Amino acid sequence: MAPPSATEPQNGTERKLNTTAPLEPGLDDKMGNMQKFKFPRPPTFDDPYKERAYLKGRLAAAFRIFGKYGFDEGVAGHITLRDPVEPTNFWVNPFGVAFSLIKASDLILVDAKGEVIDGGEVRLLNTAAYMIHHAVHEARPDVICAAHSHSIYGRTFCALGRKLDTITQDSCSFHNDHVLYESFNGVVLAEEEGKNIASALGQKKAALLQNHGLLTVGKTIEEAVFWFVSLEKCCHAQLMADAAAAGRGGETVKIGEEEAVYTHKTVGSPMAGWFSAKPLFDVEGRPCIASFPENHLLAFSMHSIGWFLGNSG
């Protein structure tokens, strides 16, 4: 049986006003409208050129987030953004530039024919990026962003030839909402292969590309990025859980269908994906002590020691 709503009184207790978000993250439209707490929403723009500038900044941040997570593998991997000015075009990373170094000015604009028509100094295009992402964007007008890379746990799980089990609350985001693309024909350099991937994806949010890696899509950059990060972690969790269960001669405990469907409505909506990515982008956009140069850390440490000695005893 699906769990009761977190906003309903339990055991005869009176309903009290929630001062914190009552759902986790509780962002599907129907539930969101019922809440006293107003969740933020993605910004909207009247000027598509201003929207383009903003989204390019977010896309560059997305690459740096991927870099921090170690999702880069040599020159493999790409995230694309449908251009708000000309929606048949998309922005993508230049081939060979490290994820962690990408700025908005480095991004390149690719048209429907696969020609680079604008961008930074490096205008090399990864052919596989065009073949996969052009096909996905063309087949799915609702997709603003698509992300693919050869992350370690994702590509490991993709070698098993199976879909993800629903064994955690987080994996409920992908319950009946991801596919297994059961084919590997080498690097995607042919238009037909890109179309096959897009066809297999259908209306789902994610695909496990067998012997290859993960692909996620979203109505916002943030959504696509969060689904990728979350799917990678779900693959990691299942690899560990399956190994631990097998070592004990047992199996993992699966979440029931009704509970999984209920939870997917809460944690698997586009708005849930967008909002869940907020901490990732907030951290990327602000300096923190973990990113300070070593000499700054040393100066900070010496200052702290001096303050402690001067204020103790």
Predicted regions and their residues:
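Class I SAM-dependent methyltransferase SAM-binding "motif I" and its flanking Rossmann-like core
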Residues: 152-189, 193
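Flexible, glycine/proline-enriched loop segments at strand-loop-helix junctions
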Residues: 49-52, 118-127, 179-188
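N-terminal low-complexity or amphipathic/hydrophobic leaders
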Residues: 21-115
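Short, conserved beta-strand edge motifs with alternating hydrophobic and charged residues
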Residues: 148-150, 181-182, 207-210, 218
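A conserved C-terminal secondary-structure "cap"
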Residues: 2-53, 59, 208, 213-313
